Amino acid sequence: MWRPMRLCHFHSTLLQSRQKPWPCPAIFFRRNFKSPPARTSRARLLWRRALSATVVGTPFLLGAYYFMAEASERRKLRLAVDGIGRFGRSVKIGLFISTDYWWCTNVVLRGVEENSPKYVEIMSACHQRAADALVAGAIRNGGLYVKLGQGLCSFNHLLPTEYIQTLRVLEDKALTRGFREVDELFLEDFQALPNELFQEFDYEPMAAASLAQVHRAKLHDGTDVAVKVQYIDLRDRFDGDVQTLELLLRLVELMHPSFGFSWVLQDLKGTLVQELDFENEGRNAERCAQELKHFHYVVIPRVHWDRSSKRVLTADFCNGCKVNDMEGIKSQGLAVQDVAKKLIQTFAEQIFHTGFIHSDPHPGNVLVRKGPDGKAELVLLDHGLYQFLDEKDRSSLCQLWRAIILRDNAAMKKHAAALGVQDYMLFSEVLMQRPVRLGQLWGSHLISREEAAYMQDMAREHFDGIMEVLKALPRPMLLVLRNINTVRAINSNLGTPVDRYFLMAKSAVWGWSRLVGAAYQGIYGSSLLRHIKVLWEALKFEMALRLEILAMRLTALMLRVLVRLGFAPKAEAEEVYQYLEM
């Protein structure tokens, strides 16, 4: 029988004493994790105690500082913490929207025709998701975010329908603040509480906007007033919110180079600073009232300066319904057509005559009430954002409008260039919000699908060009365009009861006539010759305008006849007809 060979005692001991390359777990842990020397153990213990003291002591010290600090310092600490949350939410929303659009356009819709039902359905769902995310984020963050969302509502000719319908929620949506915050602000600005400054003060806000909320109150002499109280933290968080939005817009531009809106935010910085100064708003209101005093149907609430500051504005209380509330207008026994006409004439007067232009005339800032004569009065609110258009730019704008109506392409190009724009035809269509090349609609045959699609999708197809046009404009003209487009949107919401194009052009006629009259004063010695020259130019302009309106109406009538006879697709012809009526 075979037996295994055994080593002698000497060699066996030598083999066992040799270190193994892979020791058993017990030996490994005993060898590597045995108790450290006393000096190392003492240092590690000190580090642990210091770390524990930092973790426990820092919150305690911050809490003690918070409770010992003044109210304004405590507010800044809260803002710092809340700012982290707003930043995180904003980045999350920006990444979600950018990624969603990238995935839909580059993966889901790769190879799909743009006008196919599948493409339209998927992009519509993508637009809706993005709009929902924007609204939810704006409401949650409040302040500046809501303000920018409201501004987007007026771009209903440029943004998809899903955005416009969803963003309208922000026109009346804002976070209200409690009475303690109102008291704190009054103590900081007036060293008195509201019930000391007013005979009555309702802490429940009657309206809330993106920058402030409005309270109803009564002065000691019995005058009913509206007190606009700015949210106390807006000035402190302004810089941080603007920087966050700049970062988001740059992030979106990296993924979508054609989406170049970061320059808009740069321009809005200065205007938002104006809106945060309620003393400036009061001065704007008084100037507006003075310049529009010949329009007896325009009402500007009187400012009470002894109860106003940079963050509080007290003015006469004026009741009324929103200018786009058709039912509210009719319930007062007023004519919608009269309201729309007065609205357009009021802001056309500012654009073409005074040059001092209300830049935020959204429906919440224009109320309608019945006047002493039984007809509509317009109450203009929120005068925080105004833009002054100097005589040079106003002259170029009037002459451009005149050239468009006279179909003078050379003059259109010249006056658009004076405003800094090279693509004069695209700018003219953006300015007029309707087709300038009306001749393209005429022909002995039916309107083609391509022409109808151009009318419907001009903004979408020329998005890059529109961005270049807007960037090239003088900055005052941006807010003028905002005014024009907001008024157009209100007129459209009222069912287009009046011809905005005709009223605006007619105002441009007289604005240009005044400028020409001033220019001819130094050329013609006789005032009679000067007036004859001005009247002749105005008459030519008036005739061209009426011929233009007639051509528009004949075009619309022809389209309807063709539809009735079955020679034109009803849906496409109706879209063009509606566009002509805008």
Swiss-Prot record:
Instruction: Give the membrane topology.
Output: Single-pass membrane protein
Q: Report the locations given in the UniProt record.
A: Membrane
Write out the GO cellular component annotations. membrane; mitochondrion
Q: Which Enzyme Commission number(s) are on file for it?
A: 2.7.11.-
> In the record, which residues are listed under signal peptide?
none
Q: Give all residue intervals belonging to the Protein kinase domain.
A: 179-419
Keyword Transmembrane set for record: yes
Q: What class of enzyme is it?
A: transferase
Q: Which family does it belong to?
A: Belongs to the protein kinase superfamily. ADCK protein kinase family.
What does the UniProt function comment say about this protein? The function of this protein is not yet clear. It is not known if it has protein kinase activity and what type of substrate it would phosphorylate (Ser, Thr or Tyr).
Q: What is this protein called?
A: Uncharacterized aarF domain-containing protein kinase 5
